[in-house]
Design a protein with these regions (language model features):
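C-terminal structured domains
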Residues: 115-118, 156-158
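Catalytic cores and motor modules of nucleic-acid processing enzymes
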Residues: 96-97, 103-105, 134-135, 146-147, ...
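Membrane topogenic helices and adjacent juxtamembrane segments
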Residues: 1-7
Length: 171
């Protein structure tokens, strides 16, 4: 025996089964026309994402990304420092999708929006200690008519990760 998994199978027909499996997997993956691929690469760049991330979100949801939710923790905005750092502001300004700030805790939403013009708007985030149903309702209010699977959350704290499930967000 070779290795922990007893080595390659010696059963008759192994290479044929491997060939069939490879062909079936290849047939499942669609071949995108080059122009569609170029368009998606450009869209990923417009969103500030690498293509692999954009493609995985698009494959998971079947939709394009139309908005980002940024928690104040991810933007390093605090009650004492309401303006985000220069590098983050430049990167955020280049994103071609709706950019919504979610100030956490005692950070006023109107002040966060006013001092960070790169954000399209800022709306108070769900309380970190709020239950799942409350967080879901709050995120639905924030998103309005935009379906959750077209929105990406950029968070920094473990409790913020639960907002993805609560709001049925793309990631």
């Amino acid at each position: 025996m070779i290795g922990h998994n007893r080595g390659p199978s010696m059963a008759p027909g192994e290479t044929w089964r491997r060939h069939c499996w490879t062909q079936a997997r290849t047939a499942l993956l669609p071949v995108l026309p080059i122009e569609v691929l170029r368009t998606r690469v450009r869209r990923a760049a417009d969103l500030g994402l690498d293509y692999r991330t954009y493609a995985s979100v698009r494959a998971q949801t079947g939709h394009d990304v139309v908005a980002f939710l940024f928690s104040s923790n991810a933007l390093r905005v605090t009650a004492l420092q309401l303006r985000m750092a220069g590098a983050a502001a430049v990167k955020l300004a280049a994103v071609r999708a709706e950019r919504i700030g979610l100030p956490v805790g005692r950070i006023p939403a109107d002040a966060m929006a006013a001092l960070n013009p790169e954000l399209d708007r800022a709306v108070a985030a769900p309380a970190l200690w709020a239950g799942f149903a409350v967080a879901r309702q709050r995120l639905r209010e924030v998103l309005g008519h935009v379906p959750g699977d077209r929105v990406i959350l950029v968070g920094d704290q473990p409790l913020e990760a639960e907002w993805c499930a609560a709001g049925r967000l793309a990631g």
